[in-house]
Design a protein with these regions (language model features):
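Sec-dependent N-terminal signal peptides
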Residues: 12-20
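A domain-start/cap signature at the N-terminus of enzymes
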Residues: 21-73, 85-91, 99, 130, ...
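Short substrate-entry loop that stabilizes the transition state in hydrolases
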Residues: 65-115, 191-192, 215-217, 276-277
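The conserved beta1-alpha1 loop
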Residues: 75-79, 186, 209-210, 271
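Cap/lid segment of the alpha/beta-hydrolase catalytic domain
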Residues: 108-133
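Alpha/beta-hydrolase active-site loop
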Residues: 126-149, 170
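C-terminal catalytic histidine-bearing segment of alpha/beta-hydrolase fold enzymes
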Residues: 204-208, 224-226, 237-303
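Conserved alpha/beta-hydrolase "acid-adjacent" motif
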Residues: 214-226
Length: 303
C-alpha cells in the first residue's frame, strides 16, 4: 500500500510540474494546444486560443519535410465571408508547396458581429469589422509553428484574397520583423492601415488586381486605397521608385526597382479582370499562386 501511495504521489507531482511549466510559459493572451502525437505530413486542423477566442487554421506540411532542413512558411488568407477550407480549394497552393518545398497555412477568420468571417488589418484603425486581434493571432501562429517545425524564420510570407488581401498589408506594416514579403489578389489597403503603418524594414510586395473589380474597385473608393495608391505607398517605403512597365496580352506588369536594380514591388494590372483569385486564367502561362510564390520567395528578412 505504501508503494502504491508513493507511486500515486510521484504521478501527481509529475503532473503538477508539467502543469506549472505550461502555465508559466503560456499564461499570456494565447493558449496553444500542444499535440502529443508526432506531426504527420499533409493536412491537419489546428486550433489555439488568442485573446480569449478559439481560433483555427489548416496546416499543410509537404512530403519533402524533414527535421534536418529548414523550410519557408506561407500563410494564405481567405476573403470576407469565406472559410479557410473553401479558400484552400480555390487558391490551392498545395501543389506548389510540394514542388517548391514550403509549409503552408490557411487560417480561419473570426466571425464579426453580423456573423461573417473577416480579417482586421489595422489594430488601431476605425475601419475594422470588429475589435478582434488578427495581427496577434497571426504572430502566434508563426511563433508556435517555428517552435514545432523546422521553419526558416527569415522566410515567412503572407498572401491573401480580398479582405485577406487587406490583412496582408496590415501584417507587412506590423510584423515586418517576421514577414519578409506579401502578396495580394483583389485586395487593397484601408486608409487607416496606410496612415498607421509602422513597418520597420523593407517588405517585398506583389499586387494582382483587375480593372473590372467592382467589390474592391481598382481605382479605390471611400476608405479603400486605389491600386496605384497602394503601389506608390510601398514603392516609396521600400525606396524602389524606378518603374519598369511591360504590356502583355490581357495584363500589364509594373516593377518598381531600387538603385541596385532589385524589384521590391510588383503590380499586375489585369485588364477587365474581376474580383477573383482565378488560377484558371493564366498570366503569361502562370497562375496567380505561381506568380505570387515566385516573387515572394526571392525575399528573406535581410532583403
Amino acid at each position: 500500500i505504501f508503494f502504491n501511495f508513493m507511486d500515486n504521489m510521484n504521478r501527481y507531482f509529475l503532473l503538477f510540474i508539467i502543469s506549472f511549466f505550461f502555465f508559466f510559459f503560456y499564461n499570456n493572451n494565447s493558449e496553444i494546444e500542444i499535440s502529443t502525437e508526432t506531426q504527420t505530413l499533409g493536412l491537419s486542423q489546428r486550433s489555439l486560443v488568442h485573446d480569449g477566442i478559439r481560433r483555427t487554421y489548416i496546416l499543410y506540411v509537404p512530403e519533402s519535410y524533414n527535421e534536418g532542413a529548414q523550410l519557408p512558411l506561407m500563410i494564405n488568407f481567405h476573403g470576407f465571408g469565406l472559410s479557410a477550407a473553401v479558400h484552400m480549394n480555390e487558391a490551392d497552393m498545395r501543389p506548389l508547396a510540394e514542388s517548391e518545398n514550403f509549409i503552408l497555412v490557411y487560417p480561419q477568420g473570426a466571425q464579426s458581429g453580423d456573423g461573417f468571417p473577416h480579417w482586421n488589418p489595422d489594430p488601431i484603425g476605425g475601419n475594422n469589422k470588429s475589435d478582434i486581434d488578427d495581427i496577434g493571432f497571426v504572430e502566434v501562429i508563426i511563433d508556435s509553428l517555428e517552435e514545432e517545425l523546422n521553419i526558416d524564420p527569415s522566410r515567412v510570407y503572407a498572401s491573401g484574397y480580398s479582405n485577406g488581401g487587406y490583412l496582408i498589408y496590415g501584417l507587412a506594416c506590423r510584423l515586418s520583423n517576421k514577414i519578409a514579403a506579401v502578396g495580394s489578389v483583389a485586395g487593397t489597403m484601408l486608409g487607416s492601415t496606410q496612415n498607421n503603418c509602422a513597418a520597420s524594414a523593407p517588405v517585398g510586395v506583389i499586387n494582382i488586381h483587375g480593372t473590372a473589380d467592382y467589390d474592391v474597385p481598382y481605382n479605390g473608393t471611400t476608405g479603400l486605397k486605389s491600386a496605384a495608391d497602394v503601389v506608390n505607398f510601398w514603392s516609396d517605403l521600400n525606396q524602389s521608385e524606378i518603374e519598369e512597365i511591360s504590356e502583355n496580352n490581357g495584363f500589364n506588369q509594373y516593377d518598381y526597382n531600387d538603385l541596385n536594380g532589385d524589384t521590391y514591388v510588383r503590380h499586375f494590372k489585369i485588364i477587365n479582370g474581376g474580383h477573383t483569385w482565378d488560377d484558371n486564367i493564366r498570366y503569361g502561362g502562370k497562375s496567380s499562386s505561381q506568380i505570387i510564390w515566385e516573387f515572394v520567395s526571392l525575399f528573406n528578412l535581410s532583403g
